C-alpha cells in the first residue's frame, strides 16, 4: 500500500483546539481531501495559557502538557482517518506544528518552543511525524515565522495579479505575492486572541461570533492610539511576534476601568484591522487583491472593517481561490512535512530573515 497522503495538524495561538487535514500532493495542484476539528478541553486551554508566562514548575508542566497534547493530536488524527476512510499505512507523515508557548527569536540565543511529545504521537498513531519546524530557521538567523508564505506562494501566486494573503489566527500575519514572483511575509499584530479573551471574560462566549458584540460598541480612539504606539507596529519587516506580547494583561495596562466592555471589544477589533491595513498600505505597494484565511475570516464585521480600511482593493476569503479559509494553515504544515521528507527547503529567507533556504523540521520515524 503506497503511503500517498499527508496529515497536517495545527493548534494556533488562539488556543481553541486542533485543526487536522488530509492532503494529497501528487496532483499538479495540492488537494485538501478532508478535515477534522477537535476542541481543547477548557482545563487544557487554561493550563496552556498559563505557560505563556514564567512561573514556578513550568518545565514539569510543559513536559506533562506535551504528553497531553500528543494524546489529543492522536485523537484528532484518528477522527480524521475514520472520517476519510484512510488507513494509517496510506499516510506518509504527519506534519505537527505543536502548541507554541514561547517564541523569542530576537534573544541572544534565539529560541522557540512548540509543545508536543512527537515520539509519543508516533507511538499512538503508527505514523511518521515531522515537527519542530521553526527552530532551524531561527538557528540560521531568521525569525522562525511566518513559515506559511512558501505554501501561499505555491498555491496562490499569479503572474498577472498582485495578491496579499492575510492569516488572522491568534496573531495576524500576511504573505505578499507580487506579480514578479518575489515573496515577503511577516506578522502584523494581534489577531483573534485578545478579542477572544475579552469576549470570554465579559460574555461567557468563547469568541465574538461574526463580530456581533464588537459591532454594538464604538471604537475608543484614544485607547486605540495608545495601543498602536507599541514599538512593534513601527518595526520594518521581517518581524514576528509572540502570543504573550498581545494579551489582556498588556491591554489592562492601558485601561482606566470605566470603559464599556463592548467599546473595548470594538477597539480591539480595530487594532487588528489597523495592524493589518498599515502593513499592506506600507509594504505591499500596488496589491489589488487581499484574501483572508484563519479564524478571523469568519468574523464578518472584521472583514467589513478591513474592506473599509483598504478601500479600492478587493478583499475576500481564500475560499474564492479554492481553499477553505478555516483549514489553510493545517494544510500548510502537511506541505511543510512533505518538503522536509523530499529534501526541499521550507522557508523563504526574504520572509524570515534567515541566512538562506533551510530544511525545516525534525523527523520521528514510525
From Swiss-Prot:
GO biological process, one term: amino sugar metabolic process
CDD domains attached to this UniProt entry: ASKHA_NBD_ANMK (cd24050)
InterPro entries linked to this entry: Anhydro_N_Ac-Mur_kinase, ATPase_NBD
Enzyme class: transferase
GO terms assigned for molecular function: ATP binding; kinase activity; phosphotransferase activity, alcohol group as acceptor
Record EC number: 2.7.1.170
Domain of life: Bacteria
Gene3D superfamilies named in the record: 3.30.420.40
Catalytic activity: 1,6-anhydro-N-acetyl-beta-muramate + ATP + H2O = N-acetyl-D-muramate 6-phosphate + ADP + H(+)
Binding-site list for ATP: 12-19
Keyword field: ATP-binding, Carbohydrate metabolism, Kinase, Nucleotide-binding, Transferase
Annotated pathway: Amino-sugar metabolism; 1,6-anhydro-N-acetylmuramate degradation; Cell wall biogenesis; peptidoglycan recycling
Presence of keyword Nucleotide-binding: yes
HAMAP family (UniProt xref): AnhMurNAc_kinase
Task of the protein: Catalyzes the specific phosphorylation of 1,6-anhydro-N-acetylmuramic acid (anhMurNAc) with the simultaneous cleavage of the 1,6-anhydro ring, generating MurNAc-6-P. Is required for the utilization of anhMurNAc either imported from the medium or derived from its own cell wall murein, and thus plays a role in cell wall recycling.
Family the entry assigns: Belongs to the anhydro-N-acetylmuramic acid kinase family.
Protein name listed in UniProt: Anhydro-N-acetylmuramic acid kinase
Organism of this sequence: Nitrosospira multiformis (strain ATCC 25196 / NCIMB 11849 / C 71)
